[in-house]
Amino acid sequence: MRYSFCMLEKTNIPLIRALNLTLVSLCFAMLPNPVHADSLPERIDLFVSLFDYNSATTSYDIRSIQTDFPTRLLTPDSMLPQTSEYPLKDIQLLYKLAQSCTGKLPLSPLITEPLVFTRSLCKGSSLSPRWFARSGLIHPGGGTYAFRYAEKYPAQFANLLPYMHIQERPNAAEGTLLYHLQNMGEDAINALVSGASMFGSGSDLWLRKGDIYYLFNEETWLTNANKAGLSYSLLSADNTCFIQRGNICWDVEDHSDLLRTSMIILVIANIFLVLGWSGYRWNSKRQEMRSRMLILQILTHELRTPIASLSLTVEGFRREFEHLPESLYDEFRRLCEDSRRLRQLAEASKDYLQSDSKPLASDWVPSVEEWLQYKVEEEFSGNVTLKLNQDIAAKLNVYWLGTCVDNLLRNAVKYGVAPVTLEVITQTNLVTFKVTDQGSLTHRDWRHLRKPFVSKSGLGLGLTIVESMVGRMGGKMSLEGPPTTFILEIPCETDTASR
């Protein structure tokens, strides 16, 4: 399951792919070395075998420890009242006797030794070191007989030291056995008393080989644990211990935190790289669009020369109009109209290309009603009904707005359901155009229809252009229905006083 942390999503971006490969290599490098033993006990055995006992900081013979420091002089429980070994009532009587040296004597045979000790203190009679050696060492009230006796007879303190608990003795010099014992925790003391194969105390590892305990410093301990692929913690109530040796809980070395950190770094790096790559692509596209716009500007500028020449030619024909045969009148009219439209298109394109993201230029239309009425009658031959709430003068971009309205009307006539209506609502600083047919499109279809090259009735590209132009004029376009209604809202200057 560890290898799943290093499974990364494929990408076609070379820089991100290179980073992914680098971090994958790092992930696998952090995984446990395959030469490690498979099972946890085998790894612990490997850990033990890595120690050089000649490099131990010191060593102690367990038999000497047992001789010099009996178990009762080591365990912390010995410093507490021994209520589990003596009748509580007799301990209470013994306590009263020790306080006043008078009173009823306890009768339990278990209390004989403490009674002898207490009466000796009351009478002032001496006790030889041999008595302490033969005794149970620990007083029923906790602590040793020797320490209690030395409190009353300080001159005997040095002679009675071997019979005192390690916590009752003066602090030993650093590096001595007593120093190590006095600084051990309860779990370490219990591990030592039980003869555990290893246990930890402070920064030292006590490692048993035969009857000898060898002490190794923390650096050696950690180095060998890493080599064996192990992690450890000292025994506590909060830990779940899979395999315990002394007071040490062993587990396979866990790289999950490091791997998790690496994956977070990878995700963040990928995000920044994707953002950088997206910014680079956006700038590249923007530069490409600018180059194309420049070319279009040049072409538009160059088109003005032949259009101007064509206009002069048409003007020459106009001056000789009376000499033209009647059979050419219709062709000449179309030539004049096409020449005018070409000139408008060139000017509108120049305006569009030069304005960049600015609103398109606009001119005053003296009568919105007359402008639209001419468009409806001339170009749609009565297939479209015009409705206008109030005629006004408005400042509009006639060419592009006319193109947008034409596009919507042609779509409605060609793909919609008759009758088709163009409704114009004029307000102060706003003109709204509504192109309605009896189709069934609703506002839910707008997101799909506005995509370029959508094949639904061939509307996609035209609507995309219309929406773009409306946006350039500072307006907005929307769809409502049924019936199908395309709405153009164009902010503009208006003037009702001139009407």
UniProtKB/Swiss-Prot annotation:
SMART domains with a match to the protein in the record:
HATPase_c, HisKA
Q: Which residues lie on this side of the membrane: Cytoplasmic?
A: 1-12, 281-499
Q: EC number(s) per UniProt?
A: 2.7.13.3
How is this protein induced? The Vxr system positively regulates its expression.
Query: Which UniProt keyword terms apply here?
Result: Cell inner membrane, Cell membrane, Disulfide bond, Kinase, Membrane, Phosphoprotein, Transferase, Transmembrane, Transmembrane helix, Two-component regulatory system
The entry lists its GO molecular-function terms as: phosphorelay sensor kinase activity
Where does it live in the cell? Cell inner membrane
One GO cellular component assignment for this chain's record is: plasma membrane
Domain Histidine kinase: start-end pairs: 298-494
Q: Which residue intervals are topologically Periplasmic? A: 32-257
* Residues that span the membrane, as ranges: 13-31, 258-280
Coiled-coil regions, chain positions: none
Gene3D superfamilies under this entry?
Answer: Histidine kinase-like ATPase, C-terminal domain
How would you describe this protein's topology in the membrane? Multi-pass membrane protein
Explain what the UniProt record notes about the effect of disrupting the gene for this protein.
Answer: Mutants lacking this gene display a significant colonization defect in an infant mouse intestine colonization assay. Mutants show a decrease in vpsL expression and are deficient in biofilm formation. Deletion of the gene results in a 4.4-fold reduction in vxrA expression and a 134.8-fold reduction in survival following penicillin G treatment compared to those of the wild type.
Positions of post-translational Phosphohistidine modification:
301
User: Do you know which Pfam families this protein is assigned to?
Assistant: DUF3404 (PF11884), HATPase_c (PF02518), HisKA (PF00512)
Q: Which reaction does it catalyse?
A: ATP + protein L-histidine = ADP + protein N-phospho-L-histidine
Q: What quaternary arrangement does the UniProt entry report?
A: Homodimer.
Q: What is known of its domains?
A: Contains a unique periplasmic sensor domain (SD) and lacks a cytoplasmic linker domain between the second transmembrane helix and the dimerization and histidine phosphotransfer (DHp) domain, indicating that this system may utilize a potentially unique signal sensing and transmission mechanism. Detection of the signal via the periplasmic sensor region may induce conformational changes of the dimer and close the transmembrane helices TM1 and TM2 and subsequently the cytoplasmic DHp domains in a scissor-like mechanism, which changes the activation status of kinase domains.
Sum up the protein's function in the record's words: Member of the two-component regulatory system VxrB/VxrA involved in the regulation of diverses processes, including virulence, the type VI secretion system (T6SS) and biofilm formation. Functions as a sensor protein kinase which is autophosphorylated at a histidine residue and transfers its phosphate group to the conserved aspartic acid residue in the regulatory domain of VxrB. Is critical for colonization in the infant mouse model. Contributes to the resistance to beta-lactam treatment.
Output this protein's name.
Sensor histidine kinase VxrA
Q: Which organism is it from?
A: Vibrio cholerae serotype O1 (strain ATCC 39315 / El Tor Inaba N16961)
Q: What is the lineage of its organism?
A: Bacteria, Pseudomonadati, Pseudomonadota, Gammaproteobacteria, Vibrionales
Name of the gene encoding the protein in the UniProt record: vxrA
